[in-house]
Curated annotation (Swiss-Prot):
Residue ranges the record assigns to the propeptide: 204-206
Activity regulation remarks: Alternates between an inactive form bound to GDP and an active form bound to GTP. Activated by a guanine nucleotide-exchange factor (GEF) and inactivated by a GTPase-activating protein (GAP).
Chain sites annotated for binding GTP: 24-29, 40-46, 127-130
Consequence of changing R52A: Strongly reduces interaction with EXOC8
Gene: RALA
Annotated GO CC locations: cell surface; cleavage furrow; cytoplasmic vesicle membrane; extracellular exosome; Flemming body; focal adhesion; mitochondrion; plasma membrane
Name of the protein in its database record: Ras-related protein Ral-A
Length: 206
């Protein structure tokens, strides 16, 4: 008798995460720290880099697909295509750079415009928390913005790995919850459709 085949990667739940934020805030450093446990300080910006990894989320083996987008304005026009494919977003700024914090509003607006959904899974991330002495964006200021958007705010350090796993896992939980919600809604619509069809059929018989 043939042994049971191990669960294939294709059958694992896949959660698609998009990294957004200005250039130089540490999006790639966060991604590479999460993927490979490495801190990369100097990273050449590209249009986008994609990464995939198997992880255990609350006891369930899943896959995370991370698309690390470039923050430079040159690439603004092609971001829409990336945003359409995403299921959740980590919007990153540097706590040492007020300008990058201000830019998060533009990224949020662009995401909402493309996704047409105010409740899209989304986390506001203040990176470079190890550089407290150079802080320009207060925790209170960032938390206030997160509250306005009805999202969570987390501070990270790609250098020390502080909260790196947390932001990716928290976002995956949001994505998973959203998928379950959408699935219930879809099933509810199917049931209502089926019930309406049965009622119509009964009326025809009568």
């Amino acid at each position: 008798m043939a042994a049971n085949k191990p669960k294939g990667q294709n059958s694992l739940a896949l959660h698609k995460v998009i990294m957004v934020g200005s250039g130089g805030v540490g999006k790639s450093a966060l991604t590479l720290q999460f993927m490979y446990d490495e801190f990369v300080e100097d990273y050449e910006p590209t249009k986008a880099d994609s990464y995939r990894k198997k992880v255990v989320l609350d006891g369930e083996e899943v896959q995370i697909d991370i698309l690390d987008t470039a923050g430079q304005e040159d690439y603004a026009a092609i971001r829409d295509n990336y945003f359409r494919s995403g299921e959740g977003f980590l919007c990153v700024f540097s706590i040492t750079e007020m300008e990058s914090f201000a830019a998060t509003a533009d990224f949020r607006e662009q995401i909402l415009r493309v996704k047409e959904d105010e409740n899209v899974p989304f986390l506001l991330v203040g990176n470079k928390s190890d550089l407290e002495d150079k802080r320009q964006v207060s925790v209170e200021e960032a938390k206030n913005r997160a509250e306005q958007w009805n999202v969570n705010y987390v501070e990270t350090s790609a250098k020390t790995r502080a909260n790196v796993d947390k932001v990716f896992f928290d976002l995956m939980r949001e994505i998973r919850a959203r998928k379950m919600e959408d699935s219930k809604e879809k099933n509810g619509k199917k049931k209502r459709k089926s019930l309406a069809k049965r009622i119509r059929e009964r009326c025809c018989i009568l």
